[in-house]
Regions:
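Long, positively charged amphipathic alpha-helical accessory segments at protein N-termini or as interdomain linkers
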Residues: 5, 69-71, 76-95, 105-256
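Gly/Ser-rich oxyanion-binding loop with an adjacent helix/lid
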Residues: 98
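N-terminal lobe of the biotin/lipoate ligase/transferase fold
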Residues: 1-91, 109, 118, 254-256
Length: 256
């Protein structure tokens, strides 16, 4: 597919329960590569059905991709596009990609992604990739969130402008994913700054693993090297990093 052949479609809603829910319910009548975004979500959600707080002024949207069936590919498309869009609109902010589906500033979460299959007759027919980006939170509001969070742009980035930038970059990565998913993964892995960082991985039930992110496997698994040098793969979990580790890793990336 040529990049000029793919049309970008936007649908702007004032209020919706969840943009992912909307796209999954209406995918049949929506065109491929439609970006649905809303001013307010009343039931926004993230990974593991966690609540995504959705105040007006921030970005909440879902991209429908009918030519991809693997949710992991969708995560790569949208995370790379979101990273490029934020670097374009706020080049002074050190945003970085964190496995499995987040964008961070230092050790604080600035954006999250939820990629879901749209299944019909027991077969994945398309994917709906939701993205929430903190654009307008005040520092006092961020302090009330139970995990470290950050906002990009201090309310200066309009959600509609961000939607346009996001779609522009997503178009390029979507076509790349259709043509050669291996190339998309290679680029995503290269730009995933978690690799090389010291981290703690929470597996649930009060179980934690500490080590260094040695890489990410093509199927999306995090390769973690523990203190004894043994590498294991993990497909889910919550990653925690400290500011010193983040800054050290990002500085090494700049030099390489």
């Amino acid at each position: 597919m040529d990049i000029d052949e793919l049309q970008i479609n936007f649908l702007h809603l004032e209020t919706v329960d969840s943009t992912n829910n909307f796209v999954k319910q209406h995918h049949a009548e929506l065109d491929d590569f439609t970006l649905v975004y809303a001013d307010i979500q009343t039931a926004g959600r993230g990974r593991l059905d966690r609540t995504w707080i959705s105040r007006q002024g921030n970005f909440f949207g879902t991209l429908l991709m009918k030519k991809l069936a693997n949710p992991f590919l969708g995560t790569m498309v949208v995370s790379l596009a979101a990273l490029d869009a934020l670097k374009s609109l706020a080049p002074e902010v050190p945003v970085w990609l964190k496995w499995p589906n987040d964008l961070y500033i230092d050790e604080c979460k600035a954006a999250g992604i939820l990629s879901e299959s749209i299944v019909q007759a027991d077969k994945s027919r398309a994917i709906a990739v939701g993205l929430g980006v903190n654009l307008a939170w005040e520092s006092s509001e961020l302090a009330q969130i139970d995990k470290p969070a950050a906002s990009v742009g201090n309310g200066k980035i309009n959600p509609g402008k961000f939607a346009s930038e996001l779609a522009k970059y997503a178009k390029m990565y979507y076509i790349m994913g259709i043509a050669c998913s291996e190339k998309l993964f290679e680029l995503w892995h290269k730009r995933n700054d978690l690799v090389g960082m010291d981290l703690i991985l929470e597996l649930g039930n009060q179980e934690f693993v500490q080590g260094v992110a040695a890489g990410i496997a093509p199927d999306g698994a995090l390769i973690l090297r523990d203190v004894s040098g043994v590498e294991k793969r993990y497909y889910c979990g919550d990653v925690s990093v400290n500011r010193e580790s983040v800054r050290k890793a990002l500085e090494l990336r700049k030099r390489s």
